[in-house]
């Protein structure tokens, strides 16, 4: 079985906490194949692992958030999403009946800059729907910019090639404060 761990800013770069748990899981299942999809700030972290990777880690894919290609927004050449693409985006933002196959297809096949997407009409309308349905007591401009900030790293990661695996597990810390 191929198991892909998706880890942001922890394993295999830093010791302790989530990283220790991931390392223990990999070592305790030597007959399973593990793939790491790591999300780090920039290329300075590339290959600088705090752990010696076990033999059953067969691939490490590093995603560098600093590599975001903003592109430019051309006001005369606005990119509009078709109905299926818009529904995929909207369902993701509303976290309602997300059709992941459509989401992945959209981010892998649509040639659009993150800047065009986040500053475009379609993202605006999907966020406006979320705002009206769930958060009308918040100042809309604050909500819109917060959503842009939150979705930028997710959209960037969705645009990268996801390694093939049988199981995907995103590891994270949970802060109770």
Kindly give the residue locations of the regions a language model identified.
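N-terminal subdomain of nucleotide-sugar transferases
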Residues: 1-119
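Short, well-ordered alpha-helical microsegments
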Residues: 22, 175-176
